[in-house]
Amino acid sequence: MPWSKFTKVALGLGAAIAAVRSTMFTVDGGQRAVMFHRFEGILEEPVGEGTHRKIPWVQKPYIFDIRTKPYKINTDSGTKDLQMVNLTLRVMFRPDVVKAVVAQFNADELLTERPQVSALIRETLIKRAKEFNIVLDDVSITGLSYGKEFSLAVERKQVAQQEAERSKFVVAKADQERRAAVIRAEGESEAARVISKATAGAGMGLIKLRRVEAAREVAITLSNSPNVVYLPSGGNMLFAMNGPSKVVA
């Protein structure tokens, strides 16, 4: 029984510590935090160094490194007495401008509006560099990558969009085929109706006319092909009015 009480006390103490830790976060030296509020969006005022409180689930801090970073550049140059010298320059910079601009766009916009993001970064950096008599020729984003989970989500979204477009194409094709079948059936029905009406009006005269036209075609074929023999199935050797016939080469 004492051991059970000790376990309960330990679990309760651990839960209390976890609850307290979930309401606090720490910003180290050389860092700043941007607070995202689930209902209000990104708060304008950045959070400085130290330990701060947050509302679990409602607030989430994003911590950025603002320390000055070195960047080395190797270049060749000529001296006054025409001697070539190789120089290694160290440029100290802070990525404040890049982070400030990127924070204005969401992840999808960075992909679709990359030229606009580059232009905004370039404009801001050129304006800032002029204060120190530095001329920047160009600034552009040459690489952009996300975390594995977001990349997989983007890939799944693209696959879903492709499947949706494919489904639309299949549905449209089926609809066109259905319409074509309806039009073809309507045409055949209309043709049958016209033939039936003509036959009813002309009687056997129309049928005899068709037979005469068929016999004329056979005669033309025989005249153009002396090696072809016409073999009627019935007793009429000229027009084969009373039965089927065939042409044998």
Curated annotation (Swiss-Prot):
Q: Which CDD domains match?
A: SPFH_prohibitin (cd03401)
Q: Report the subcellular localization.
A: Mitochondrion inner membrane
A GO cellular component term found in this entry reads: mitochondrial inner membrane
The UniProt entry lists membrane topology as:
Single-pass type II membrane protein
Its principal location?
Answer: mitochondrion
Topological domains on the Mitochondrial intermembrane side lie at 26-249
User: Where on the tree of life does the source sit, at the highest rank?
Assistant: Eukaryota
**Where does the sequence pass through the membrane?**
9-25
InterPro entries registered for this protein in UniProt: Band_7, Band_7/SPFH_dom_sf, Prohibitin
Q: Which residues lie on this side of the membrane: Mitochondrial matrix?
A: 1-8
The alphabetical list of record keywords is: Membrane, Mitochondrion, Mitochondrion inner membrane, Signal-anchor, Transmembrane, Transmembrane helix
Subunit-structure text? Component of a prohibitin multimeric complex in mitochondrial membranes.
Q: Which family does it belong to?
A: Belongs to the prohibitin family.
Question: Entry's PANTHER family?
Answer: PROHIBITIN, PROHIBITIN-3, MITOCHONDRIAL-RELATED
Q: What does this protein do?
A: Prohibitin probably acts as a holdase/unfoldase for the stabilization of newly synthesized mitochondrial proteins.
Q: Under what name is this protein listed?
A: Prohibitin-5, mitochondrial
Q: What is the lineage of its organism?
A: Eukaryota, Viridiplantae, Streptophyta, Embryophyta, Tracheophyta
Instruction: Quote the gene name from the UniProt entry.
Output: PHB5
